[in-house]
Regions:
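Surface-exposed interaction/gating patches
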Residues: 91, 123, 135-141, 147
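Residue-level detector of Asp-centered blade-edge/turn motifs that repeat once per structural unit
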Residues: 36-39, 86-89, 136-139, 187-190
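Structural recognition of the beta-propeller blade-terminating site
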Residues: 5, 46, 56, 96, ...
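Conserved beta-propeller blade signature
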Residues: 41-43, 92-93, 142-143
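Intrinsically disordered, low-complexity repeat regions of secreted/extracellular protein precursors
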Residues: 25-28, 74, 79, 87, ...
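A short loop-to-beta-strand structural motif that recurs across blades of beta-propeller domains
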Residues: 1-2, 50-54, 100-104, 150-154
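Gly/Pro-rich loop segments of beta-rich domains
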Residues: 7-32, 58-80, 108-132, 158-186
Length: 191
């Protein structure tokens, strides 16, 4: 990951830059999702290494803060991670697409806690099916683009199941449906 200052003719490597691999100073694939907190720490979703890494500002290598134990369904593993969110306490939320769940990793934790889904793939309100993206609001409600079910789900903090807030009536163009391929979500200030 490169940082480019305005007007600069070249950038500075701030994370990675040591070839492809699984060492703590490498990434296993092209990086598509990362997050920078107010302390300038960089959280990187390393999809092919099934991990989220934190690179402290100015560090030469990262630390694994979620996953990193190969692909799988145990609470210390991820399977096709597809999104990250870092809250104000630096807890890491991972959209674990292959396990049809969202997992929260507390700072310093070695395992995550399922906060949405995690009951196999399906269409019940306690399940997700190929979730594609998510958004977490200031009250820690989780909104999930549940693309396999053509719906958007809202999971309140501590809830064992979500509620459908959009779609959920199959693929299509009717006012109560979501089209296939609707895989991004954004919530405005009105919720």
């Amino acid at each position: 990951i490169m940082k480019w200052l305005p007007g600069a003719s070249e950038g500075t490597v701030v994370a990675g830059g040591n070839g492809k691999g699984n060492a703590l100073n490498q990434f296993g694939s092209t990086i598509s999702r990362f997050y920078v907190n107010s302390s300038k720490d960089i959280y990187v979703l390393d999809h092919n290494q099934y991990r989220v890494m934190k690179w402290a500002s100015g560090a030469n290598s990262g630390t694994v803060v979620a996953g990193g134990n190969g692909s799988g369904s145990a609470l210390n593993q991820l399977n096709s991670p597809n999104g990250i969110h870092i809250d104000s306490s630096n807890n890491v939320y991972v959209l674990d697409k292959g396990n049809h769940r969202v997992v929260k990793w507390a700072v310093g934790g070695s395992t995550g806690t399922v906060v949405a889904g995690g009951n196999g793939s399906g269409s019940n309100n306690n399940q997700l099916f190929n979730p594609a993206s998510f958004y977490i609001d200031s009250s820690e409600n989780i909104y999930i683009s549940d693309t396999g079910n053509y719906r958007v789900m809202k999971w309140a903090t501590g809830a064992s199941e979500g509620t459908v807030v959009a779609g959920g009536n199959g693929n299509g163009g009717a006012l109560n449906q979501i089209n296939e391929g609707s895989d991004h979500i954004q919530i405005n200030s009105n919720g």
